[in-house]
Structure formats: C-alpha cells, structure tokens
C-alpha cells in the first residue's frame, strides 16, 4: 500500500473511533494487533483489547472529537499521528476520582500498517499533563508522606 493509503486507514480509524463505532475494529485491525502504551512495560495483544482500551477511556471521559490531526506523517509502513484532545473526566481513571475539570493534552500515536490493517501501535499520551490539569498530582511542598 502507498503511504497515502496507510494514512487513510489511520484517519478512518480515528473518525470512527470518535463516533464510537467499535465494529470498525474488525475491519481495520489485524487479529494479532500489538498495542504499546508508553507508560506500560508490556504490550497488549489482540483486537478485543483495542476495543476494551478505547471503550474504557471513552467511558471515563467526556471526549470532544478531535480527528483532525495536528501532524500526520507517513513513511513506508509507518504512520505518525499527533492530535490535541480535550477531555473531562466523568468516572474514575487510573485510580483517580473524577475531578470534572477539563484538560487539553497532546497525544502521539505511531501506527504500523500491513496490507491495509493496523498491526501495531505505539501510544504516547501526555499523561503527566493530563493528571496535572485534572489536579491529580501532589502539590510540591504540600506535605504528605
């Protein structure tokens, strides 16, 4: 596939993700898909995990759709996508209670495409920026243990 076709696969996924169309996962992701999250040492494998990760995030946050990229670059079988996401927590996330504060954070994904399917993804969200904006980080000099 061409780099433009690979970009189209990623854009289609993100547009459908923002609509909550999880059925598209079976069409766009390889059965043996591998997901790498920057903060987790072990990758997650399988299409069912794609859905679980995305549904959990969408369940925890009100997300304002952002499928317009800040950056979209492709070379060979790789596509790099950067987006700015606005979100407000509505349920607990990573052990933190919802603060109802809105956050705007950058997210960078690197996708590997093979034969029109997403086979691997590296996700690099600005988790520090997210937690800071939500007030879920300890204040320096604020005491504590």
What kind of region is each of these model predictions?
Residues 1-145:
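C-terminal and inter-domain tail/linker signature
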């Amino acid at each position: 596939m061409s780099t433009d076709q690979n970009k189209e696969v990623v854009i289609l996924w993100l547009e459908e993700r923002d609509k909550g169309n999880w059925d598209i996962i079976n069409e766009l992701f390889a059965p043996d898909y591998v997901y790498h999250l920057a903060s987790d040492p072990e990758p997650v494998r399988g299409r069912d995990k794609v859905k679980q990760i995305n549904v959990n995030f969408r369940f925890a946050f009100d997300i304002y759709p952002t499928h317009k990229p800040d950056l979209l670059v492709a070379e060979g079988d790789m596509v790099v996508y950067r987006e700015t996401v606005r979100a407000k927590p509505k349920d607990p996330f990573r052990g933190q209670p919802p603060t109802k504060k809105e956050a705007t954070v950058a997210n960078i994904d690197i996708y590997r495409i093979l034969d029109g399917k997403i086979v691997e993804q590296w996700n690099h969200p600005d988790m520090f920026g997210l937690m800071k904006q939500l007030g879920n980080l300890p204040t320096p000099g604020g005491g504590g243990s």
